[in-house]
Curated annotation (Swiss-Prot):
It is an enzyme of class 7 (translocase). NDH-1 is composed of 13 different subunits. Subunits NuoA, H, J, K, L, M, N constitute the membrane sector of the complex. The keyword RNA-binding does not apply. This is NADH-quinone oxidoreductase subunit K. The lineage of its organism: Bacteria, Pseudomonadati, Pseudomonadota, Gammaproteobacteria, Enterobacterales. Belongs to the complex I subunit 4L family. It comes from Blochmanniella floridana. InterPro entries: NADH_UbQ_OxRdtase_chain4L/K, NUOK/Mnh_C1-like. Keywords: Cell inner membrane, Cell membrane, Membrane, NAD, Quinone, Translocase, Transmembrane, Transmembrane helix, Transport, Ubiquinone. The keyword NAD applies. The chain crosses the membrane at residues 4-24, 28-48, 60-80.
Length: 100
């Protein structure tokens, strides 16, 4: 079994990478991917803490979070397709200019 600090360190690194991906990239699809990485890293933290405490609650929460992330992803991709058909771009800055 891996130590708690190593598991939480990996989740923090994944969360930071997702946040960095959301901040740096201006493409709506990459922002969505960064958000998904952040959600899954938070869910992984549930599993790590649950394994450390010897409880199955972390794995149950992980399944719940993955289910919610899948539904959120499906809705976001539908909005992304609609946005691309309307604006012909996925660049967030260009979309902000069109709205103004």
């Amino acid at each position: 079994m891996i130590p708690l600090s190593h598991g939480l360190g990996i989740t923090i690194i994944l969360f930071a990478l997702g946040l960095l991906g959301m901040i740096v990239r201006r493409n709506f699809l990459f922002i969505l991917l960064g958000l998904e990485i952040m959600i899954h890293s938070a869910a992984l933290a549930f599993v790590v803490v649950g394994a450390y405490l010897g409880q199955e609650d972390g794995q149950i929460m992980y399944m719940l979070v993955v289910t919610l992330a899948a539904s959120e992803s499906a809705i976001a991709l539908a909005l992304l397709l609609r946005l691309h058909r309307y604006c012909h771009t996925l660049n967030v800055d260009s979309i902000n200019e069109i709205v103004e």
